[in-house]
From Swiss-Prot:
The encoding gene: psb30
Secretion signal, residue range per the UniProt entry: none
Gene Ontology cellular-component annotations: chloroplast thylakoid membrane; photosystem II
Record organism: Euglena gracilis
Disulfide bridges in this chain: none
Protein name: Photosystem II reaction center protein Psb30
């Protein structure tokens, strides 16, 4: 397997995992304000 492919897969999984987390944090901050 190519290291570039692994890096792309890793970044994709990171984005899919952190995406909802960041959105949740933004919503919580808006709710507090």
């Amino acid at each position: 397997m190519n290291s570039e492919l692994l890096i792309q897969l890793g970044s994709l999984t990171l984005i899919t995992l952190t995406g909802p987390l960041i959105i949740g944090i933004i919503f919580i901050r808006k709710g507090n304000l």
